[in-house]
């Protein structure tokens, strides 16, 4: 029997999506955002493929034929999983694809911020070097990576992959996770002892704004905060104030609370030498995206074969 499959935001994945191994009718759209568009485009579809399209309870109620939501990402906070479960809809996600791309982005942000690479490069373009009385100048502090301490909040597969890279660079690694593991420390230790802190936890009601003004004040004044996970983990207003006040040394963010920031965002709009914001691309190396695309199709094919894999529980 032919299955109707719809990819609602194909533009979000720059990789080849191979043809399915079962009889199917396939349709893709570059982007889909409004509930009305979602419902219209998924009429009669059994399988929805999405990346960041919001699948809320009111929308799902209007899609009686839907049986599978295949998310082209690890995070599934865009899906109302409880509503999906109640309606008999299976939700699957992508796992273990970003083992190089995200850690490398974290390390890149760490080097850029600790070594003040961006502000110094910008100063050269402004002509500051031409005007210098010496062969160099020290407008922005530079700190070594080797010998410094990395604090990892969320010690899953990505956290462990980053830890290996950090140790190879000569860093001391501290890690915190809500799930007990040998060798972990508490959050207070991470905040007070780390030179660089990187976040790798999902966005849940418990983790929303887990880093706010109180936590930022506990960090070293030279410390760097890196977030390549979810924007809602950090109170952005508190972070911006901390950067302006010198409460912490800098921040590197690949995510913000609302994406895309169509109405502006205080971090994206800020002009600070100690802040780097990239447009949610830490996951998006060419290699990683192809691994993701292949696994996305694998997930759909496994479901159709009656052997669902990578199922996300409500």
UniProtKB/Swiss-Prot annotation:
Enzyme class per UniProt: oxidoreductase
Entry's localization field: Cytoplasm
GO molecular function, one term: hydroxypyruvate reductase (NADH) activity
Pathway: One-carbon metabolism; formaldehyde assimilation via serine pathway
Any Gene Ontology CC annotation: cytoplasm
EC number of the protein: 1.1.1.29
PROSITE patterns: D_2_HYDROXYACID_DH_1, D_2_HYDROXYACID_DH_2, D_2_HYDROXYACID_DH_3
UniProt cross-references to InterPro entries, sorted A to Z: D-iso_2-hydroxyacid_DH_PdxB, D-isomer_2_OHA_DH_cat_dom, D-isomer_DH_CS, D-isomer_DH_CS1, D-isomer_DH_NAD-bd, NAD(P)-bd_dom_sf
Active-site residues, as the UniProt record annotates them: 230, 259, 280 (proton donor)
Residues bound to NAD(+): 74, 157-158, 228-230, 254, 280-283
Pfam family, one: 2-Hacid_dh
Catalytic activity line of the entry: (R)-glycerate + NAD(+) = 3-hydroxypyruvate + NADH + H(+)
Keyword Calcium: no
Described purpose of this protein according to its UniProt entry: Plays a central role in assimilation of carbon. It converts hydroxypyruvate to glycerate as a key step in the serine cycle, and may also play an important role in C2 reactions, by interconverting glyoxylate and glycolate.
Family listed: Belongs to the D-isomer specific 2-hydroxyacid dehydrogenase family.
Name of the protein described by the UniProt record: Glycerate dehydrogenase
Organism: Methylorubrum extorquens (strain ATCC 14718 / DSM 1338 / JCM 2805 / NCIMB 9133 / AM1) (Methylobacterium extorquens)
């Amino acid at each position: 029997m032919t299955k109707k499959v719809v990819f609602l935001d194909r533009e979000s994945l720059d990789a080849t999506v191979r043809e399915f191994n079962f009889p199917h009718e396939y349709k893709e759209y570059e982007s889909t955002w409004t509930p009305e568009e979602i419902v219209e485009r998924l009429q009669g579809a059994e399988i929805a493929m999405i990346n960041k399209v919001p699948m809320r309870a009111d929308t799902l109620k209007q899609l009686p034929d839907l049986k599978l939501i295949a998310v082209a990402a690890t995070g599934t906070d865009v899906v109302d999983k409880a509503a999906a479960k109640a309606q008999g809809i299976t939700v699957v996600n992508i796992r273990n694809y970003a083992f190089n791309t995200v850690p490398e982005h974290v390390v890149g942000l760490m080097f850029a911020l600790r070594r003040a690479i961006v502000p110094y490069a910008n100063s050269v373009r402004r002509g500051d070097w031409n005007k210098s009385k010496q062969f160099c100048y020290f407008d922005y502090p530079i700190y070594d990576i080797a010998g410094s301490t990395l604090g990892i909040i969320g010690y899953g597969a990505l956290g462990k992959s980053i830890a290996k890279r950090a140790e190879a660079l000569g860093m001391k690694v501290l890690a915190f996770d809500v799930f007990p593991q040998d060798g972990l420390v508490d959050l207070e230790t991470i905040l007070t002892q780390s030179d660089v802190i990187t976040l790798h936890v999902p966005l849940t009601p418990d983790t929303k704004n887990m880093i706010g003004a109180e936590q930022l004040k506990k960090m070293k004044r030279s410390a760097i905060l890196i977030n390549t996970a979810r924007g809602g983990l950090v109170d952005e207003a508190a972070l911006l104030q901390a950067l302006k006040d010198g409460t912490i040394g800098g921040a590197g963010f690949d995510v913000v609370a609302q994406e895309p920031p169509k109405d502006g965002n205080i971090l994206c709009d800020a002009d600070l030498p100690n802040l780097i914001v990239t447009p949610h691309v830490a996951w998006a190396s060419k290699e990683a995206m192809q691994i993701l695309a292949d696994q996305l199709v694998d997930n759909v094919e496994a479901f159709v074969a009656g052997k669902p894999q990578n199922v996300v529980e409500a």
